[in-house]
Design a protein with these regions (language model features):
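Flexible "cap/lid" loop of the alpha/beta hydrolase fold
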Residues: 25-60, 100-107
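Conserved alpha/beta-hydrolase "acid-adjacent" motif
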Residues: 130-139
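Conserved alpha/beta-hydrolase catalytic His-Asp/Glu region
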Residues: 64-100
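Catalytic active-site module of serine/aspartate enzymes centered on a nucleophile-bearing elbow/loop
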Residues: 147-179
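Active-site nucleophile elbow and catalytic-triad environment of alpha/beta-hydrolase enzymes
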Residues: 92-114
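Short beta-strand immediately N-terminal to the catalytic nucleophile in serine-hydrolase-like folds
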Residues: 5-7, 30, 124
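Short beta-strand/loop motif that positions the catalytic acidic residue
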Residues: 117, 123-125, 129
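Gly/Ala-rich beta-loop-alpha elbow adjacent to hydrolase catalytic centers
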Residues: 6-11, 15
């Protein structure tokens, strides 16, 4: 049988591209890049949280050694993330590929008209996502004409959060219900 696909953020964009050309049994897009690309969220971050915006720029230019863990927490985790885990994950952050950043800006919108309409699809949002807000995440579900759900209290990296089991259970339950 075709695979069940789960993609997060940029990986959700990869899943959308896959669906344009290949069958799948089901797909879940977790905190996906919005159809408008990164520009709206980047602008919102630059105006609303300039320190966070500056930290992203420093990290992109110089790597994880420039990351302030408090800012990293605001960026991708909820307030519930334990300090030790936050420090461990912050050290593992790497610069994004310039090509990938370009693709997420210029080619961010999936092309659902190319995909099979029979693939059950679900969009999962993180309620406290500083990168992609609920409206932007909902736009992905609207584009694909599929269901959408928000997990309150979760940061962008919901699969690493202390409450990751809630995200996993939500996905598993939906896959079973989708058949």
């Amino acid at each position: 049988p075709p695979p069940i696909l789960v993609g997060h953020s940029m990986g959700a964009l990869v899943v959308q591209r896959y669906l344009e050309q290949h069958p799948a049994s089901a797909a879940v897009l977790m905190a996906p890049v919005p159809p408008q690309g990164l520009w709206p969220s980047t602008l919102r971050m630059a105006v609303g949280d300039p320190l966070l915006y500056a930290q992203y720029g420093l990290m992109q230019a110089f790597g994880s050694g420039m990351i302030d863990t408090d800012v990293a927490q605001r960026a991708i985790f909820s307030e519930q993330m334990p300090d030790q885990a936050l420090t461990t994950y912050a050290r593992r952050v790497q610069r994004e590929s310039q090509r990938a950043l370009w693709d997420m800006n210029v080619h961010a919108a999936g092309r659902p008209w190319l995909a099979s309409k029979s693939v059950p699809l679900r969009v999962l949002a993180a309620g406290d996502d500083a990168l992609f807000n609920l409206e932007e995440t909902r736009a992905v579900a609207s584009l694909w004409g599929c269901g959408w759900q928000s997990l309150p209290g979760m940061g962008h990296a919901m699969m690493l959060e202390p409450g990751w089991q809630q995200a996993a259970d939500t996905i598993i339950r939906w896959i079973w219900e989708a058949g």
